[in-house]
Design a protein with these regions (language model features):
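Short helix-initiation/N-cap motifs at beta->coil->alpha
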Residues: 34-41, 113-127
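Paired acidic/hydrophobic, glycine-rich loop segments that form the ligand-binding mouth/hinge
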Residues: 131-136
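Periplasmic solute-binding protein
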Residues: 1-32, 59-84, 169-178, 236, ...
Length: 295
């Protein structure tokens, strides 16, 4: 458009949910964690009950993966990167608690957890090396695929555990029409069909991620994929602001991720680490002109 803004239709909505090994939980009489205290306790209890098995698979590799994992916990624990005036608050008590949670999870994880990206964390869960997985809903299809998973039929799904509030990440994809498209009318009709109730249900029945709440609640969909009702409930708590969508976020995110990696691998003091992230983030924001209203 004239403003250069981007618009699109949601397609394949995702959020964070907790996958857990039903067989392991039943074997040891464990309850599905409802809050972070229970989650962290289980993450470190399971390796004691099942030697060689990690508690909770998590991203942790330096950069984007460590930052993503931190943000996954920051929001439910009541934290944020910025306050309403765009002042960094990542180093407040909630931020420290989120970093402590991530370190506990990684320390009690499977061998090599500190270097896990998304693929490695998922692989650890699919291979049966870890008892829990807290990340995106898009993995459900792989969990149920015998060609990719050793835990088919042994995984249950639950809402992202409560922190100070019920919250989960927001992800997914979108579809739009390029300004220079030659067949805009045809493209619009295709978008209309793909995002329709019929199209959304076809996606779900094929094992994909639907976008409509009605699809998540559909009887046919749930008969084939019983987890869909839980995923639909989880989407109601998905926070679109779980990470700042601003032009300079990439730079701040990279710094956050590399700094957190030092917390995980070098035992850098958490408060010191987050104080540094906050100070550098403010410099980036200042240089980008975010505080001109204060001048």
């Amino acid at each position: 458009g004239a403003t250069g803004s981007l618009f699109g239709m949601p397609y394949g909505s995702e959020t964070s949910v907790l996958g857990y090994r039903k067989d392991i939980f039943e074997k040891h009489g464990l309850e599905v964690p409802q809050n972070y205290d229970e989650l962290l306790a289980l993450a470190c209890q399971i390796p004691e009950l099942e030697p060689g098995m990690g508690g909770l698979a998590s991203r942790a590799a330096s950069g984007h993966h460590a930052a993503h994992a931190f943000l996954l916990h920051l929001n439910p624990l009541g934290g944020a990167i910025f306050d309403e005036s765009w002042e960094p608050v990542v180093n407040n008590a909630a931020g420290v608690k989120a970093a402590e949670a991530l370190k506990t999870i990684v320390d009690c994880g499977a061998e090599g957890s500190v270097n896990f990206g998304f693929g490695e964390a998922l692989g650890s869960f699919l291979n049966g090396d870890t008892a829990m997985f807290l990340d995106t809903t898009i993995v459900a299809g792989q969990v149920d695929n015998p060609d990719k998973s050793k835990v088919v039929g042994n995984v249950g799904w639950a809402l992202h555990p409560m922190g100070t509030k019920r919250a989960s990440q927001t992800g997914g994809f979108g579809i739009g029409i390029p300004a220079n498209a030659e067949n805009k009318d045809a493209a619009f009709l295709l978008m209309q069909w793909l995002t329709s109730k019929e199209g959304d249900k076809l996606v779900a029945m094929a094992g994909g991620n639907p976008s409509r709440f009605s699809t998540h609640a559909d009887a046919d969909v749930n008969a084939k994929f019983p987890h869909m009702a839980t995923f639909g409930e989880a989407l109601q708590y998905a926070d679109p602001d779980w990470r700042p969508i601003i032009p300079v976020w990439g730079k701040i995110n990279a710094d956050l991720g590399t700094t957190l990696s030092k917390v995980l691998t070098e035992d850098l003091d958490i408060q010191e680490a987050l104080d540094g992230v906050a100070a550098r983030a403010r410099t980036v924001m200042d240089e980008a002109g975010y505080y001109t209203w204060n001048e």
